[in-house]
Amino acid sequence: MEFYLSSDCASLARYVSKVVYLEDNDIAHIYDGELHIHCSKIGSEDFLFRTVQKLELELSKIKKGPYDNFMQKEIYEQCETTKNVMRGRVDAFTNRVVLGGLENWLTELRRAKRIIMIASKSSFHSCLAARPIFEELMEVPVNVELALDFVDRNCCIFRNDVCIFVSRSGETTDTINALNYCIKKEAVTIGVVNCSGSSISRFTHCGVHTNTGPEKGIATTKSYTSQYIALVMIALWMSEDLVSKIERRKEIIQALTIVPSQIKEVLELEPLIIELCDKKLKQHDTFLLLGRGYQFASALEGASKMKEISYVHSESILTDELGHRVLAVASDNPPIIAFATKDAFSPKIASCIDQIIERKGNPIIICNKGHKIWEQDKQKGNVVTLEVPQTVDCLQGILNVIPLQLISYWLAIKKDIGVDLPRDSAMSAPDI
C-alpha cells in the first residue's frame, strides 16, 4: 500500500480517493505498508483512531482545460463559483437566507454584542468589504483584524463576542493561532473556508463552506468573491429577526441572485483591458488606486493583486486622503485607477477625479454603465472608463474587483511573468 503526505488535499486528487486528516499533536508512523497514528502529548493514549474520509474532488476541476493558465481559468469560473456559494442558501421567492452550518448556534450568534472578523491577505480584504453591511444590518460594533497583529496584541475577547475566521485554505497559520486564542477566551467562532476538512473548519463551532472548488493559482481570485458573498449571507442570516431591516434585506437578496450574470457582463471587458494594458499600462511601474466606502476594500484587493502578480508598486488610497502629496505624484502621470460606481460617496469621488484631470492626470475610471459624467473628458482622451453593471452598494465591490483581476493578469502576461507561480510566494506552488 502506498501513502502520500500533503498539506493540501487538492494536490492528491490524481493519486488517491481517500484521505486521513491529522490533528494537532498527532504523529503519523508509516512502516511496512501500515499507518499508525500516535499522540505526542504525555499521558494520552498511545494509539489513536482517525476516520478515513472520501476525497470529493473532481480531477477535471484541477486542470486548466482550454485556458492558458489557472489564474485565467479561475477568473472566468467566478460566474459559476458565485452561484455555488449561494446554491440552496439564498431563496429569492421567500427573501430568506438559510445557513444550515450555523443553525445549531442560532441563539448565541444573534445575541452577539460584538463581531470580530479575523483573516490574512485577500481574506482580510473580503472582511473589510463586508464590514459595513454587518454594521448596518446587525447594529453592533464590528472589528476587522489581521490575524498576526490580533495575536501579537493579545486582544480583549469576551464570551458574548462572535469571531469569524476567513481563510481560503483553512490552514492559514496566523488565522489558526488567532482561532486557538479565541477558543481559550470562550468566544463563539465561525469558519468561512473553502476546504471542508481543514483545521479552521474542524476547530470552529460552526461555519459556512464557500463551495469554490480547488484554486490552483497562487493569486486569490474566485475565493475572494465567494468569501465576500458568504460574509454578506451571514450578515443577512444573523439579522433576520430585525424587523426594521426587512426591506434592506430583500433588496440585497434580490441583487445577489443576479450577481453571477453580471459577472459575465464584466468579463466582456477583457478585450478593452488587453488593449489598455498593451498601449497605456505595461510601461509603468507605479499605480495608484482610489476608493471610498465599500470600494476601499476593492482598491486594497486590486493593489495587492498588482503587486503579487504584475510586480509593480501599487498603492490604495481613500479618495478624501487625496491631499497635495498624492496630487503631486499624480502630476507625474502614474496610472490612477478610481472606483466611481454609484453609491453615497459618488459626488465626493467625482470631485477627486476632477482634481486629477485638472492636474493633467489621466485616470482610469471604473464606473457603472450609462455613467455620462466624464463623457467629454473621455472624448478628449483625458480618461478611460471601464463600465460595469450596477447593483446594490454592498455587492458592487464583487463586480468592481474583476477588472482589477484582469488588469493584473494581462499586465503580467505582457511582461512575460508566470502568473500561476509568482516569485517569492509564501504559499505552496500549484501542480502545473
Curated annotation (Swiss-Prot):
Signal peptide: none
Molecular-function GO terms, alphabetical: carbohydrate derivative binding; glutamine-fructose-6-phosphate transaminase (isomerizing) activity
PROSITE patterns for this protein: SIS (PS51464)
A single BP term in Gene Ontology: UDP-N-acetylglucosamine metabolic process
Keyword annotations from UniProtKB, A to Z: Repeat
Domain of life: Eukaryota
InterPro entries: GlmS/AgaS_SIS (IPR035466), GlmS/FrlB_SIS (IPR035490), SIS_dom (IPR001347), SIS_dom_sf (IPR046348)
SIS domain span: 105-244, 277-422
Protein name: Uncharacterized protein EC1118_1M3_2531g
Native organism: Saccharomyces cerevisiae (strain Lalvin EC1118 / Prise de mousse)
